[in-house]
Amino acid sequence: MAAMQDLEEHVKEVAADVIAASIGTDPSAYLNMKNYRDRKKADPKFNLAYVLNTLQGKLKVKKDPILHYATAYGSVPPWILLKSVYFSTIITFISKFKPAEQAAVAERLYDYNSHNLTIDQCRMLMMDTLYICLDYRNTAAHGGRIYLLSPKSTLRKQEIFGNPHVGGTGYGQLLFLLGLLKYRRPYEQLRSILNKELTRHCNEYPNDSTYLAQALNIYIEYKK
């Protein structure tokens, strides 16, 4: 799912920039537990210590560009290290950021004033969006059907927007969430592919348009 991979790389870049600006570029600083917050989870994989240990392990990888930076400069900056981790790891890492750094990431991803959101609502929107996108990315990576997916992660609609019905559900909700981002390419990629496939299918099976619109929770307008 190219759009989700595109979003993943963008989020990694933004997170790395925020870390570098706020904490520093040396791993001894930006992988120091005191610079983050930890809320204990039942699953240890979602705890701060596990995430930091994972990132520390990546520093030992004997492959470029990590090896190059470690050898040439004696240090691996966050924008190099974070490129090597899974989307799930970077999302969990961002969830451990202190409020100021998490807000800085959210401000880079959203124009929250135009959405009439507070920065705290924007932080919630960011985390919910990332976890929902991860569900779609993982499903696609394992060959699952994403168009009819009901993600395990949920959007806190009432807390964020004051409306429990905003954004719809399913694939329509995914498009809604991607459409709120400043970085438009993932949304445009998904929308373009969907329009192309729907046009092809509905030209061949026009009676399917109503069913597909309901299943995907989107409005369908196709060219014959």
Predicted regions and their residues:
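Amphipathic alpha-helical interface elements
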Residues: 1-224
